Amino acid sequence: MEKRIALIGTGGTIAGQGASDTDLTGYTAGVLGLDEILASVPGTQPYGPYTYTQFSNIESSDITVKHWLDLSKLVQQLVDQDDIGGVVITHGTDSMEETAYFLNLTVHTDKPIVVTGSMRPAGAISADGPINLLQAIQVARTPETAGKGVVVVLNGYIDGARDVSKCNTTNVATFDSPLVGHLGIVQDGIAHYYKASTRCHTKDSEFDVRDLKELPRVVLLTCYGGMDDMVPMSVVATNPDGLILTGLGHGTIPQNVRQITQNTKFPTVRASRTGSGMVSAVPQDTLAGYLVSDTLSPQKARILLMLGLTRTKNLKKLQQFFYKY
């Protein structure tokens, strides 16, 4: 018998409903259950059998660290079962890239894990949820998806969890990997791959959250022209476990902010607000005690630092995580 695909619903626009079929922005996310979403998707039966879990039904902007921990544990339990061949998760697009990266670092498996969603609610004209879910299932059923880590599937494209970003507020072609490009495409019911991530993930990851109930508190602070001292001073005063500084350009930190955030008792990572490119170490980082995010977005750098702090507080070892993952 064919192994089952485990379907997990978390909410989001794919489960949303608007006041009319032309309401593309004022709708309510997380209304429909997973069973109702599936009922709107023709052509899924040949790719079964399935299991179904309604994990949550929320807007993805409301996702919490506890949600990530609980979802990771659920996915791990599922992939550890011999009769499960892969996992498909429906999720809101606003924080999809973060959830996908968290699972990419914390679920230990070779089995396909696919995250999908939609940019238009279920009742909208030309809703993209049904085709995205069908193609996500097709990707999970494609043998070549095994070992690729967590992937995100929308609009016919396959992206790796590490590098994918939401790049448009409303367009259905919102997901891209600006620096490295898509891993592949979905065509005629099959995933076609043209590249793979070279960074460690899933089965090779050293991060294990199965016994954790919380994670270190890491704060993200965005820098901008004309930034005064008040916000960085307030953040430092809360004494977080870690800080991601989203700098300008090549992660550049304004001098006044640097004076406040350098050589703190907690690790501080420089990232960039540009959306693409590498933040590399410079001599001033050693003086300030800063780490660098490599090519991770600020929000993903936050996730990696949270997980890294569960393993070590050594700055050199933490920096190596950013080069490894």
Give short role names for the model-derived ranges:
Residues M1-Q77, S276, T312:
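ATP/NTP phosphate-donor binding region
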Residues E2-R4, I8-G12, S20, G30-T44, ...:
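Accessory alpha-helical/coil subdomains and C-terminal extensions
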Residues D21-V31, S95, Y101-I113, G129-Q135, ...:
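A glycine- and small-aliphatic-rich helix-loop capping segment at beta-alpha/alpha-beta transitions
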Residues Q81-M96, T238-H250:
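Short acidic, glycine-rich surface-loop motifs adjacent to enzyme active sites
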Residues I84, T109-P112, T264-T268:
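A short helix->loop->beta-strand "cap" motif at the edges of active sites that frequently abuts
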Residues I89-K111, I253-Q262:
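Short Gly/Thr/Asp-enriched flexible loops that form oxyanion-binding sites at enzyme active sites
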Residues H250-Y325:
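C-terminal non-catalytic interaction/assembly regions of soluble proteins
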